[in-house]
Amino acid sequence: MLKSRIKYNTASFVTSAPDITKLPADTGIEVAFAGRSNAGKSSALNALTDQKLARTSKTPGRTQLINTFELADVDDMRLIDLPGYGFAKVPIEMKKKWQKSLGEYLQKRQSLKGIVILMDIRHPLKDLDRDLINWAISSEIPVLALLTKADKFKQGPRQSQVLKVRRELSALDGDITVHAFSSLKGTGLPDVAKKLDEWFLGPVVAVPPAEKILNDDTNPTS
């Protein structure tokens, strides 16, 4: 079982919205999942929540709406599945519509407190990925970059690719964390849960052990 402060398996579907006007009230905290149409975004959400929460399709580009999922064990906190971007075979008008919905959400949604950007580990940091990361940095939104389909690489090449992406993104001077991820093998899943816990609930503060107070009976004066 996934160890986390929030029970992500309590997530449930709320609504699918064509634009931000149809989303739930802009209150509380939202964490959005975004990525290219073939990056494995829906599979990552399903792995995190341990259920078939987000629809997966063998045809990239099928997610056309902003899908909202509510976390049952915490108040006013949501996971957002944003439309996939960058799939070449999508009709141009549909692509423009998706880009408009995505742009409106990212620019105007006040409850957005973190964004998970998923990229195929074999082809990371495409132009649209970089655009999204740069937007997040300029808006002071923290980013968790997941290099998906990590099971396609052995451990050595996988780690080399992670380090390469970390080096590139470190030059951007933003709050960016990079991990390898595989929804098939569960690689990186604890890292995702830990980061989302921080965004939703705040970082874990280490509490120093209470000082031992000695009273006159246990520490008599001479």
From Swiss-Prot:
Biological process terms in GO annotation: division septum assembly
A Pfam family per the record: MMR_HSR1
Names of required cofactors: Mg(2+)
Keyword S-adenosyl-L-methionine: no
Keyword set, alphabetical order: Cell cycle, Cell division, GTP-binding, Magnesium, Metal-binding, Nucleotide-binding, Septation
A Gene Ontology cellular-component term: cytosol
Family label: Belongs to the TRAFAC class TrmE-Era-EngA-EngB-Septin-like GTPase superfamily. EngB GTPase family.
Stated role: Necessary for normal cell division and for the maintenance of normal septation.
Name this protein carries in UniProt: Probable GTP-binding protein EngB
Protein's gene: engB
